[in-house]
């Protein structure tokens, strides 16, 4: 009987604890934890990107020199004639990433891909 009471008091004290570094466990007990595939994650520190759990501050390259945050943005390759450009677009919460309709964050780089070799006289 004494171990049950001790365990109940311990859990009550743990839930009522206001010590730093301890998150409010009552919030986690009342709400289902978000899932990424079969894994749960902490949305205050992580996100689920295409079935992979990432840290919120993780970055990736878009093109050769432009960084973006995959938790909040996605990288798109767009072509205009013979030029390709990488564009970072916002991810719209609750919607699947779409390179055509998502708002543009920034245009990263343009790369020229000529259909035929360019001679020096073409540039002058």
From Swiss-Prot:
InterPro entries assigned: IGFL
UniProt KW keywords: Glycoprotein, Secreted, Signal
Keyword DNA-binding tagged: no
Signal peptide coordinates: 1-19
Pfam family, one: IGFL
Gene Ontology cellular-component terms listed: extracellular space
Residues carrying covalently attached carbohydrate according to the record: 57, 84
Tissue expression remark: Detected in the cerebellum.
Subcellular location: Secreted
One function term, GO molecular function aspect: signaling receptor binding
PANTHER family in UniProt: INSULIN GROWTH FACTOR-LIKE FAMILY MEMBER 3-RELATED, INSULIN GROWTH FACTOR-LIKE FAMILY MEMBER 4
Family from the record: Belongs to the IGFL family.
Protein name: Insulin growth factor-like family member 4
